[in-house]
């Protein structure tokens, strides 16, 4: 009897969905309190003035204003929100 031996199953064939990480509000954009500025794993960007950080390292605005990214010594990038009064003056 001619039989074909059962073929093995592939060990690849799976992939995880993208996690939608990254900057959601770029420098110069207007934000209101609670707006998400960036989603990240770990601290790629650090919270600066008027920016809070959630338990999953998400950065969010605490006040209404304009987003600003600023590189500091040590290679860290801080994200701040300049309040409306300061942003209007510039």
Curated annotation (Swiss-Prot):
InterPro entries: Ribosomal_bL27, Ribosomal_bL27_CS. Residues 1-20 are annotated as: Disordered. The keyword Oxidoreductase does not apply. One of its GO terms (molecular function) is structural constituent of ribosome. It comes from the Bacteria. Keywords: Ribonucleoprotein, Ribosomal protein. The keyword Repressor does not apply. GO terms for biological process: translation. GO terms for cellular component: cytosolic large ribosomal subunit. Belongs to the bacterial ribosomal protein bL27 family. This is Large ribosomal subunit protein bL27. It comes from Nitrobacter hamburgensis (strain DSM 10229 / NCIMB 13809 / X14). The gene is rpmA.
